[in-house]
Amino acid sequence: MKTPITEAIASADSQGRFLSNGELQAVNGRYQRAAASLGAARSLTNNAQRLITGAAQSVYTKFPYVTQMPGPTYASSAIGKAKCARDIGYYLRMVTYCLVVGATGPMDEYLVAGLEEINRSFELSPSWYVEALQYIKGSHGLSGQIGNEANVYLDYAINTLS
């Protein structure tokens, strides 16, 4: 999994040299942001259920047909609603994983790679998850550097789905 730290080390090692001042500065920058990133991951994790429930409700409000259409890919039943919440939770978990490592690697490797195929196979609309992630971004209650760190990966997920 690529992170700013592993990329700096891999580059130096492939050239048989020590880390350059620029690479050391990049590593130091990651360490300086790490506390804010971990704070964001902790807060999103602690508030996950509230955020997921609110995000699902936001999807149902913006796309009411989701709760009216029968079938396994819609939220017209308790099972469908549980699947929707599960999927939103998956995106939120990926955001927290990215916050922990300080890079988009977890999302790229575990989510983005097969996203289009999954959505097509199960007839899932990316716009549902864009709405859910926008709700989470607007409702997480994080501010300052902690909020900025969370928003980097929420925006990345939103842009990937758009």
UniProtKB/Swiss-Prot annotation:
<comment type="subunit">
    <text>Heterodimer of an alpha and a beta subunit, which further assembles into trimers and the trimers into hexamers. The basic functional unit of phycobiliproteins is a ring-shaped hexamer formed from two back-to-back trimers contacting via the alpha chain subunits. The trimers are composed of alpha/beta subunit heterodimers arranged around a three-fold axis of symmetry. The phycoerythrins also contain a gamma subunit which is located in the center of the hexamer.</text>
</comment>
<keyword id="KW-0150">Chloroplast</keyword>
<keyword id="KW-0472">Membrane</keyword>
<dbReference type="InterPro" id="IPR006246">
    <property type="entry name" value="Phycocyanin_a"/>
</dbReference>
<keyword id="KW-0042">Antenna complex</keyword>
<dbReference type="GO" id="GO:0009535">
    <property type="term" value="C:chloroplast thylakoid membrane"/>
</dbReference>
<keyword id="KW-0793">Thylakoid</keyword>
<protein>
    <recommendedName>
        <fullName>C-phycocyanin alpha chain</fullName>
    </recommendedName>
</protein>
<dbReference type="GO" id="GO:0015979">
    <property type="term" value="P:photosynthesis"/>
</dbReference>
<dbReference type="InterPro" id="IPR009050">
    <property type="entry name" value="Globin-like_sf"/>
</dbReference>
<keyword id="KW-0249">Electron transport</keyword>
<keyword id="KW-0605">Phycobilisome</keyword>
<keyword id="KW-0157">Chromophore</keyword>
<dbReference type="Pfam" id="PF00502">
    <property type="entry name" value="Phycobilisome"/>
</dbReference>
<keyword id="KW-0089">Bile pigment</keyword>
<comment type="similarity">
    <text>Belongs to the phycobiliprotein family.</text>
</comment>
<keyword id="KW-0934">Plastid</keyword>
<dbReference type="InterPro" id="IPR038719">
    <property type="entry name" value="Phycobilisome_asu/bsu_sf"/>
</dbReference>
<dbReference type="GO" id="GO:0030089">
    <property type="term" value="C:phycobilisome"/>
</dbReference>
<dbReference type="InterPro" id="IPR012128">
    <property type="entry name" value="Phycobilisome_asu/bsu"/>
</dbReference>
<comment type="function">
    <text>Light-harvesting photosynthetic bile pigment-protein from the phycobiliprotein complex (phycobilisome, PBS). Phycocyanin is the major phycobiliprotein in the PBS rod.</text>
</comment>
<feature type="binding site" description="covalent">
    <location>
        <position position="84"/>
    </location>
    <ligand>
        <name>(2R,3E)-phycocyanobilin</name>
    </ligand>
</feature>
<keyword id="KW-0813">Transport</keyword>
<keyword id="KW-0602">Photosynthesis</keyword>
